[in-house]
Amino acid sequence: MNKNDFAKNPPMGWKSWDCYGASVTEKELKQNADYMAEHLKQYGWEYVVCDIQWYEPTADSSHYPKFADLCMDEYGRLIPAENRFPSAKEGKGFKEIADYVHEKGLKFGIHIMRGIPRQAVSANVTIKGTSY
């Protein structure tokens, strides 16, 4: 491996956790994307990431309430909390926000944990495409 095999710069972007903990809203996320597009994109900043707990309607800090009621679809997949991300209503997910960020020439991402949410296990939901 030689020195030219490495990225010249680290990935550059903004994630909601650093400013809002788990409580970011759609409005705040878009405002930060606007700022980044106007002031930072020219310097290589490109990632806008909605961090953890976007699926938790009562998230209001960096504290994680034990056994909070998470927003999930019928298969136990996490979906955005509509009270915090109104454009996600009617099963639209993050599409509108992702389109908004992409139109600014930036890349959108979400934080997601691996595995099946405890709430889905407790509810014994069926995994899509299986009989389990």
Language-model features: locations:
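Active-site beta-loop-alpha junctions of metal-dependent nucleic acid enzymes
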Residues: 28
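Mature N-terminal, pre-catalytic/accessory segment of carbohydrate-active enzymes
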Residues: 1-25
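Aromatic-lined carbohydrate-binding/catalytic grooves of carbohydrate-active enzymes
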Residues: 32, 36-132
